């Protein structure tokens, strides 16, 4: 391990504090209730999406004080903020009413083909079909769609806290592994696919079919486990009630923008321009829109941007730690490390090392996506789902420990799929 600079040491300490803060947001929300005079600041500190942006700002202030204005600005400009920008844009577009209408119609049509309890079938599809769809529309888009539809259907009813946490745990894990059918949808795969020459055929053979099995098993298991509660829920809101009738032309235009943004996902100058045109279109045809989720998407982008800034100073300890592992150790090491850092950062650091075996590369990426549902910071789409669903939990917050416990069983299924199949 190389000797760290003072800035790197400070960044590591701030990173640890940010992770601790992430697991303490429930406490700040509690303080907001018992100290109403300062409720505003406690609510701010209780927003998970604010955590990494806040500590990233503190890091930049340290760099400014210790190294000067030039170094602080140079470091910021050296960071790549394409992913936060993309997640912001894709969340807003995928969360529009016409897109939700379209996906709801597809899910409903598929559910009607299955002669079983329609509530359970639709729930299963939201946790299985939509995450796998993420391989083609990107994981952030799939997370946004699944979370919004779950919020408007299941989470809008009087259901148990156990079902809520179990659903979020399976959703986060399935989104993380469900994007591995293609080389462009999952952030940890995207970071290495071009350099390691991984195409769709490679992904399907080494990841895709295993991930699909794990996604199906996880969705089926949680559906079966809570089957009695589904039967007792007071008329679970039918999925068709999520959507109003939207003209086909409007749906097609929204899909057109969604596809273009996905195609140009690596070119912010293009997809941000498309997004501005999209905002103009939604303003012109406001009667076919529900309010855009701009606030939620901006908070998620702020979270990811903070992670980019803080994560950029962690290479000095993280990369040697990974490289000292063998194939088996790196799989489980990456799964565990993903819980405390972004899985795309792990695979990116791995891609900087030359001479890795193909088995090591596969194990690193498989471990990174396997652990992607354990915490809110583990996978880039997680803050989007967190932001959308948290209002339906007690004190409008998803407890990080509750998420961790709920995500462990589906994570173990993913471990079995990638290591035993």
Region annotations inferred by a language model:
Residues 1-9, 41-49, 70-85, 200-210, ...:
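Interfacial loop-to-helix junctions that mark the boundaries of transmembrane helices
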Residues 3, 7-32, 162-165, 169, ...:
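Juxtamembrane and boundary regions of transmembrane helices in multi-pass small-molecule transporters
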Residues 9-27, 47-65, 80-94, 145, ...:
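Hydrophobic mid-bilayer segments of alpha-helices in multi-pass membrane transport proteins
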Residues 39, 225-250, 285-295:
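Flexible interhelical linker loops that connect adjacent transmembrane helices
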Residues 60-76, 90-109, 132-144, 312-320, ...:
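Transmembrane alpha-helix boundary signature
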């Amino acid at each position: 391990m190389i000797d760290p600079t003072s800035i790197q040491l400070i960044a590591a300490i701030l990173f640890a504090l940010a992770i601790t803060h992430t697991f303490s947001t429930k406490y700040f929300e509690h303080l907001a209730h018992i100290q109403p005079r300062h409720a505003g600041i406690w609510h701010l500190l209780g927003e998970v999406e604010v955590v990494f942006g806040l500590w990233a700002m503190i890091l930049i202030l340290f760099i400014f004080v210790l190294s000067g204005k030039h170094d602080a600005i140079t470091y910021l400009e050296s960071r790549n903020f394409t992913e936060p920008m993309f997640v912001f844009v894709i969340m807003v577009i995928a969360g529009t009413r016409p897109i939700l209408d379209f996906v709801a119609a597809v899910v409903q049509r598929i559910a009607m083909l299955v002669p079983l309890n329609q509530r359970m079938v639709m729930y299963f599809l939201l946790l299985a079909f939509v995450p796998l769809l993420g391989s083609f529309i990107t994981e952030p888009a799939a997370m946004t769609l699944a979370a919004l539809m779950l919020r408007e259907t299941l989470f809008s009813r009087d259901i148990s806290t156990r079902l809520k946490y179990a659903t979020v745990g399976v959703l986060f894990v399935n989104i993380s592994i469900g994007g591995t059918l293609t080389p462009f949808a999952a952030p940890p795969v995207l970071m290495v696919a071009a350099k390691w020459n991984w195409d769709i055929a490679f992904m399907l053979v080494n990841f895709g079919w295993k991930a699909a099995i794990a996604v199906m098993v996880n969705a089926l298991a949680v559906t079966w486990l809570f089957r009695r509660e589904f039967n007792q829920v007071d008329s679970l809101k039918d999925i068709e009630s999520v959507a109003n009738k939207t003209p086909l032309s409007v749906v097609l235009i929204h899909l057109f923008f969604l596809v273009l943004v996905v195609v140009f996902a690596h070119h912010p100058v293009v997809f941000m321009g498309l997004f501005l045109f999209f905002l103009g279109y939604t303003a012109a045809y406001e009667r076919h829109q529900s309010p855009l989720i701009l606030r939620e998407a901006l908070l998620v982008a702020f979270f990811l941007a903070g992670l980019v800034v803080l994560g950029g100073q962690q290479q000095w300890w993280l990369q040697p730690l990974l490289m000292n592992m063998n194939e088996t150790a790196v799989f489980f090491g990456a799964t565990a490390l993903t819980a405390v850092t972004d899985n795309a950062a792990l695979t990116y650091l791995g891609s900087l090392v030359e001479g890795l075996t193909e088995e090591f590369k596969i194990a690193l990426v498989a471990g990174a996506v396997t652990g992607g549902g354990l915490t809110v910071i583990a996978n880039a789409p997680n803050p989007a789902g967190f932001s959308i669903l948290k209002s339906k939990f007690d004190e409008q917050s998803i407890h990080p420990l509750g998420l961790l416990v709920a995500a462990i069983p589906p994570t173990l299924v993913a471990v079995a799929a990638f290591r035993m199949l």
